[in-house]
Amino acid sequence: MARTPAKYCDLVMKGGITSGIVYPNAALALARDYRFKNIGGTSAGAIAAAACAAAAVGDRRKQMKAAIAQPEERVGFEGLAKASANLASPGFIKDLLQPAAGAGQAFRLLVTLAGNTGVLRKGVALLGSVVRIAPVETLLLLAALAGLAYAVGGQTGMIAAALPAAICAYLGGVVFAVLRIARVLRRNLMGLCTGTAPDQPARRPRMVLTDWLHETLQALSGKASGQPLTFGDLWTAERYPGEPGSDRAVTLKMITTGISHQEPRSLPFESALFWFRRKEFEALFPKVVVDWMVEKAGEPVTVAGEDYYLLPHGADMPVLVATRMSLSFPLLISAVPLHEPARRESLPGSDGENEAEDTTSDEDEQKTVLDSTEALTTGGKKRRARPAAFRICWFSDGGISSNFPIHLFDRALPRWPTFAINLVYPETSDTGSRPEVFLPENNRQGWQRHYQPIARKSAVHELCAFVFAIVATMQNWRDLLQSRAPGHRERIVHVSLSPQEGGLNLAMSKEVLAAVSKKGTAAGEAFARFSFENHYWIRWRNLASALQRYTIDIAASDAYRPKIPDYEPAYALAHDATSKPPSYRFASKAEREEAARLLEKLIGEGEKWSGEGPDLTKTAPRPLPQLQIAPTY
């Protein structure tokens, strides 16, 4: 593919299971006019983001004549076009998602219930699944109840008890079916599909999800199969002539959800340390990747007879591992288990008294999430000891907590556009008369609130719609607010999909697959109408308004009267550089004094703006943005 773009952009993609086949063609269309700097996504969007980042690295290698270890036609965006064509071929996605041993019936039931089938078919599938999942237990219960009825009342009693016995046997079968599914899920790491199938190679004429993804990432990036693509490979990739300065050539970010900690986490982990068990990872990843990670980790930590290997993080983290952690659709695709220290002990040969003295609690040393978290397992002490016990930390689909992370690469002012692709289903929400692929073309478009109708013909359907709307609100409220805000909405293209397109529809027809892929191409081409000048100006107006209002609030917070006497010493800490803070001390006297001067400047500027103006918010874009100090993840 001939490419001579001079512009750069970022790209963020939403989760959407099989709807993700929109993304490769969108990236290919964008690549005609732009070169990628930062790429991010969640769930299915993470798969597309990883593939796009790998293709971007491969393209750089081809353009810069660097060595590649793959056939040239499989590397870069030429290879991404081939991968996109494969995804759009009938049956390909279905082959990628293959159930683990013993999970076939439950897998088919989940796909049927979550897919676009009629209520009658779903009901029949649900009722019939009990007999298919637990046939022996159901029949044994029926036989036992029939035998009991015969023993008590003979043939007449057995006939009379036939219907009650069948109902009781069926209900018992429900219990056994649920227990069997629960055991299968736990055995397969909380999912019906692990993504690999090393125990059943004869049944897999094609590669399943994770094996295919590994081969695809290696091919697109031009790396050999035995050397997994890492985030460091992206960061240190070849640079184009005249490329704008940045710390990293290509940045890839994804979102996963830490179920055990109940929070979203960005990938790759750049400071947090986790461990993994080889047996668990061999069930999720290709052996060549696990072997590489074990070698990279070095000597394991052995606790209670189990070996724990340090998970490569930062530049060393394989892109495949991060992608797999983001795409673990709950119950369908296995979650990823990692481990963190639950308790630590002094290293052998250390002096207990000196160790205790050296590791006294010090909040000032907790500069990362890791330090603060591990303080909980060490009694607030610094990390000077080996893990004595581990606890499991489950990571699942990033879409659980952040399904459309359009904020991933935002800065105070943009250096280049960060585009985003949103997947919507207009038949279930009020989107007006928008075209199938919609990008706001002026500031009057894209601001309307999302509306999800609840009313249904039957009470059961309406109750279900109400419950699902609650779940969707918990999952998407922040993303929806951002997507309609000025500075965001003009850079988001919305792709409308019908109920037959994407989702858990694993058996889409050739025509449907072609239609979805075509929408992807249209989405990428839509950004040709994007005005960076208008976007940059809006972002500056947002920043000026928010900074002024925040600075005025700082002045107002300092000036309130009368002040609470008991809190006067606390107020003085920020103003008086000679006072002694209770924690998080500055590293030097100069830093402390500069911070105090900064506060005085902010107060002075806030008082001036509050009294004299001018008001930078009066004609600013609406709804108004706000500055808040919030934790990163």
Swiss-Prot record:
One of its GO terms (biological process) is lipid catabolic process. Its main location: membrane. It is a multi-pass membrane protein. Residues 352-365 have a biased composition (Acidic residues). A motif (DGA/G) lies at residues 397-399. Residues 342-380, 605-624 are annotated as: Disordered. Keywords: Cell membrane, Hydrolase, Lipid degradation, Lipid metabolism, Membrane, Transmembrane, Transmembrane helix. The chain crosses the membrane at residues 38-58, 133-153, 159-179. Residues 11-410 form the PNPLA domain. The keyword Cell membrane applies. A motif (GXSXG) lies at residues 41-45. PROSITE patterns: PNPLA (PS51635). It holds the Pfam family Patatin. InterPro entries: Acyl_Trfase/lysoPLipase, PNPLA_dom. GO terms for cellular component: plasma membrane. The active site is at S43, D397. It is found in: Cell membrane. GO terms for molecular function: hydrolase activity. This protein is non-essential for R.meliloti growth, but induces a heat-shock response in temperature-sensitive E.coli K165 by elevating levels of sigma 32 (mechanism unknown). This is RpoH suppressor.
